[in-house]
Curated annotation (Swiss-Prot):
The protein's role, per its UniProt record: Monoheme c-type cytochrome.
Species of provenance: Pseudomonas aeruginosa (strain ATCC 15692 / DSM 22644 / CIP 104116 / JCM 14847 / LMG 12228 / 1C / PRS 101 / PAO1)
Modification note: Binds 1 heme c group covalently per subunit.
One Pfam family from the record: Cytochrome_CBB3
Keyword terms of this UniProt record: Electron transport, Heme, Iron, Metal-binding, Periplasm, Signal, Transport
Leader sequence segment: 1-20
Keyword Nucleotide-binding included in the entry's annotation: no
Protein name: Cytochrome c55X
GO cellular component term of the entry, any: periplasmic space
Localisation per UniProt entry: Periplasm
Cross-referenced SUPFAM superfamilies: Cytochrome c
Disulfide bonds: none
């Protein structure tokens, strides 16, 4: 039994749209760019000063939870990046999307997970 021509046309269009979107949208992690050295210094300062004001000057916790590698272990990177960018509603955690790009937030999260930012 053959499908009606309208169904085949719609299915064909849906397939082409899916393929186009697959190649037009970068895969997570492939488009990430590391900030340049100047921006990295700014991000380190922001992390230690602004984030540290709630997460503790040593990032071991305070008003907000600890941001140590041990505390972040097992948490999905994408979830941590989303928290940085979007904040946490009903908590003191503000959204930083107005000041940070997704690459900036990803770079910060990666540094925290690896323990590469120490006060």
């Amino acid at each position: 039994m053959n499908a009606p021509p309208d169904f085949r046309r719609a299915a064909s269009h849906a397939l082409w749209l899916a393929l186009a979107l697959t190649f037009a949208c970068p895969l997570p992690g492939l488009a990430d760019e590391h900030p340049d050295a100047r921006r990295q210094a700014q991000l380190r300062h922001l992390l230690l000063q602004d984030c540290g004001s709630c997460h503790g000057l040593r990032l071991t916790g305070g008003l907000g939870p600890a941001l140590t590698p041990e505390a972040l272990r097992g948490k999905p990177r994408e979830s941590l990046v989303a928290t940085v960018l979007m904040g946490r509603p009903q908590t003191p955690m503000p959204p930083w999307a107005g000041l940070l790009s997704e690459d900036d937030a990803g770079w910060l999260v990666d540094r925290l997970i690896e323990g590469e930012i120490a006060p």
